[in-house]
Swiss-Prot record:
Function in brief: Nucleotide-binding protein.
Entry similarity comment: Belongs to the YajQ family.
Gene Ontology CC annotations of this record: cytosol
Keywords: Nucleotide-binding
SUPFAM superfamilies named among the record's database cross-references: YajQ-like
InterPro entries for this protein: DUF520 (IPR007551), UPF0234-like_C (IPR035571), UPF0234_N (IPR035570), YajQ-like_sf (IPR036183)
Classification via Pfam families: DUF520
UniProt name for this protein: Nucleotide-binding protein Pmen_0939
PANTHER family named among the record's database cross-references: UPF0234 PROTEIN YAJQ (PTHR30476:SF0)
Signal peptide region: none
Length: 159
């Protein structure tokens, strides 16, 4: 039976390239030079600046470099800024994988559409199976048309 998997993954190389581009952009900006920094560890960024409005500008720089590298900004989760001594800091994490709640929403959305496919949760992915390839393509179109709050990819399409 034909099937495909619904996953939410980040390309780590593109993410590091986007962060490096954001750091270069930060060094080029005259108003932010020397006053701000971006530190990267795994899937977490720490933005450091003298004022909160600078953090917002840095966040915009990070978003624009993510978009240039074709990474969806929905996977980025910015926490509230906090004061650390004389500087302001902000944590930015990148979410990856489909959690249980989102997987349940995806399965419910497919079932509500009454397509001739079955969806099953398998860890951090959702497996969709059907009798015909056309039914699976309808399911992909249905999922692309709905906003789930996370970027979704469709892989392992098998006949």
């Amino acid at each position: 039976m034909p099937s495909f998997d619904v996953v939410s993954e980040l390309d780590k190389h593109e993410l590091t390239n986007a962060v490096d581009n954001a750091i270069k952009e930060l060094d080029r900006r005259f108003d932010l030079r020397g006053k701000c920094s971006i530190e990267s560890k795994d899937k977490t960024l720490t933005l450091t600046a003298e004022a909160e409005f600078m953090l917002e500008q840095m966040l915009d720089i990070v978003r624009s470099s993510l978009i240039k590298r074709k990474i969806d900004c929905q996977c980025m989760e910015a926490k509230d800024p906090y004061a650390s001594g004389k500087v302001m800091k902000q944590e930015v994490t990148f979410r990856e994988g489909i959690d249980k709640e989102l997987a349940k929403k995806i399965v419910a959305h497919i079932k509500d559409a009454k397509l001739k496919v079955q969806a099953a949760i398998q860890g951090e992915q959702v497996r969709v199976t059907g009798k015909k390839r056309d039914d699976l393509q309808e399911a992909i179109a249905l999922l692309r048309g709905h906003e789930f709050g996370m970027p979704l990819q469709y892989n392992n399409f098998r006949d």
